[in-house]
Regions:
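Short acidic, Pro/Gly- and aromatic-enriched capping/linker segments at domain boundaries
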Residues: 1-7
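Short, ordered coil/turn segments that flank beta-strands lining enzyme active or ligand-binding pockets
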Residues: 9-10, 61, 70, 99
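A short glycine-rich, His/Asp/Glu-containing loop-to-beta-strand
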Residues: 10-49, 54-55, 103-104
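Short beta-strand segments in beta-sandwich/barrel cores
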Residues: 46-47, 63-68, 82
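Glycine- and acidic-residue-biased ligand/ion/polar-headgroup-sensing regions
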Residues: 53-71
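A short hydrophobic beta-strand segment most commonly corresponding to one strand
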Residues: 84-88, 98-107
Length: 107
């Protein structure tokens, strides 16, 4: 399992980095979750650059998705991977389903 952070940088671009929970104590707040959603999509989706309306944690349960950020980096997420989505401003990220997917969503 890998955890990645997608965020808007001071340069106005979105970036991706692999993170470790021990280095990000703020992720401990995720243990106090009040709401969890399950998203399952019946068709493959492709989305151009977009920011998210809120910070969220997404844990991949099934399928593969490629996320691109405006600095040109891309990352493929597989079952067990998690992403902390913090790109709530700026250009945001792209999204391309490689296979049908299901993921847990924690706002």
């Amino acid at each position: 399992m890998s955890i990645y952070r997608i965020y808007a940088g001071a340069d106005g671009e979105s970036h991706i980095e692999e993170i470790h929970v021990a280095q990000h104590p703020e992720l401990g707040a995720l243990r106090q979750v009040a709401q969890v959603g399950i998203h399952e999509f019946p068709a493959l989706r492709t989305m151009d650059f977009h920011p998210l309306p809120e910070r969220r944690l997404i844990i991949h349960v099934r399928g593969e998705v490629e996320i691109g950020v405006s600095d040109g980096s891309t990352q493929i997420f597989r079952p067990g991977d998690a992403r902390v989505m913090e790109d709530t401003s700026g250009r945001g990220h792209t999204h391309r389903d490689l296979t049908l997917q299901r993921h847990l969503y924690l706002p």
